[in-house]
Amino acid sequence: MSEEQNLRPVYDDDQPGEDTYKRGAIYKQTRSRKADYEDGENSEKRQKPNDTDNGPTAVVTDLSNEKKETRSKDKDESVALAVDADGNPIPQEVRLPKRKVAVMIGYCGTGYHGMQYNPPNDTIEKELFEAFVRAGAISKANSTDLKKNGFQRAARTDKGVHAGGNVISLKLIIEDPEVKEKINNELPDQIRVWDISRVNKAFDCRKMCSSRWYEYLLPTYSLIGPKPSTYLYNEIEASKKEIPNVIQDDVESAQFWEAFSTEAESKFTKEELEEIAAFVMPKDSFDENNETYQKSKAFKKLEAEHKRAYRISKERLDRFRSALKQYEGTFNFHNFTLGKDFNDPSAKRFMKQITVSEPFVIGEAKTEWVSIKIHGQSFMLHQIRKMISMATLITRCFSPLERIRQAYGQEKINIPKAPALGLLLEAPVYDGYNTRLQEFGYDPIDFSKYQSEMDTFKMKHIYDKIYLEEVNENVFNAFFSYIDTFNPSYNISQEQQQLKGQELQQPSQAVELVTEDLEQKAPSDPTPSDEKGKKPQRPIFDFLTARGIQLQD
């Protein structure tokens, strides 16, 4: 058995259940273990003499030395049973004490399949565990099983998601005063250990975490309204004519797209623009030197540059902030995750505070960004990405802000996930439990002591990679362009084929992810079903238009 196969992951379901802490439960477990131990000793006393014994006197002997020898022998055999990945016995080490600790870490998730150990994939936990072993913080005898070390995590991050601060708890050998430096020397530069702090034996970094801070970085051009002639734009305009005074006119977006149209007409002839509009990317192989393809590619590049030059107005930014404020409080977020029903009590979550920074310009592309910080008690799968997506769509489409509160209702709504690229875990918070730690004589778990180091790390290994990947892959541009051109009445439009082929020479993860959310139904089915098939899901497009809003009312 290989080391990777033998190294068992620790899942959140491995946590002790609530019944473990009910009155009398621990006593019963202790009594049961004691009885097993006593039976093991008494069985030796109850053994009958065999045929070679000379009567009863053979039984009446002092077994204390015999027991010690047996235990010593068993101990030696247990040490010999510890083997490496190739099945060879691991040489006996000097046994050093293990201490329960909280390890404060930060990492860039690019290139990893998430936080949690998941063989054979490369994950953050896999890198950490192997570094602990190489640095001597975990003995070789315990290097094949995470559970032997009581491994737990405060927050599990998905593939590609980063963390400025996260916490894991486990038992480590920390006698060496330079153990933190040795561990960091064994880790890649994109994973850092900020501190290793002693905690009491009952500490559980996930259960004792009172809340979590997340950050999401968003380019401000994502808040521009849909491009004229796209499906979503046409639906909004048509519904406004049918039902006036429900959705406001978006003057700023109209001026933005008019300016781009003027710029495009100065770069391309009318015939070239018509040729570009009619071009469809071939499904099979094609000649990249094709003249029309090259013109289409140049057109998309011009559009991307025009978006990056956009600077958000105060009015639109305030509208976006107001949209995000609709999440503050305790609400039923069943539409903002997967596999949750309206009646599921676990769908109710408490969002403490959401803030949006002032815009800032980063990189050679001079793209303008905002930082969104979300402080919540706990979060469900994809919840933050769906929250960002809904608030952004409400801002782009000028739909009433109340639509977000209506999404907490019983109706199922298909909300696409915003790209994972901009998401990072800022830090878990231990306000309540830190008081108890200090009472036990331990230092509180506090990331503020390492804020300067963390900021430097985030800028070099997280923020810069996010900015660079957005420029190279056009992740947010692809995501919102695909949403704007998606037609629910059939699987893929000509505009979408252009997006997949021209704007991105290789389809990015953003397009693939939004496709998963939007293409959940047959072309003729106007109400897609959720993954359980229990209730129909309402398309997000219908939810945003004046027609859909009137139906809701």
From Swiss-Prot:
Bias (Basic and acidic residues): 33-51, 64-78
Gene Ontology annotations of biological process type: mRNA processing; mRNA pseudouridine synthesis; tRNA pseudouridine synthesis
Transmembrane segments: none
Catalytic residues (UniProt): D158
Catalytic activity: a uridine in tRNA = a pseudouridine in tRNA; uridine in snRNA = pseudouridine in snRNA; a uridine in mRNA = a pseudouridine in mRNA
Region forming the signal peptide: none
Group of enzyme by EC: isomerase
Domain of life of the organism encoding this protein: Eukaryota
A molecular-function term among this protein's GO annotations: RNA binding
UniProt-annotated location(s): Nucleus
Keyword presence, Isomerase: yes
Region (Disordered): 1-78, 517-539
Function summary: Formation of pseudouridine at positions 27 and 28 in the anticodon stem and loop of transfer RNAs; at positions 34 and 36 of intron-containing precursor tRNA(Ile) and at position 35 in the intron-containing tRNA(Tyr). Catalyzes pseudouridylation at position 44 in U2 snRNA. Also catalyzes pseudouridylation of mRNAs.
PANTHER family in alphabetical order: PSEUDOURIDYLATE SYNTHASE, PSEUDOURIDYLATE SYNTHASE 1 HOMOLOG
Assigned protein family: Belongs to the tRNA pseudouridine synthase TruA family.
Name of the protein this chain belongs to: tRNA pseudouridine synthase 1
Gene name of the encoded protein: PUS1
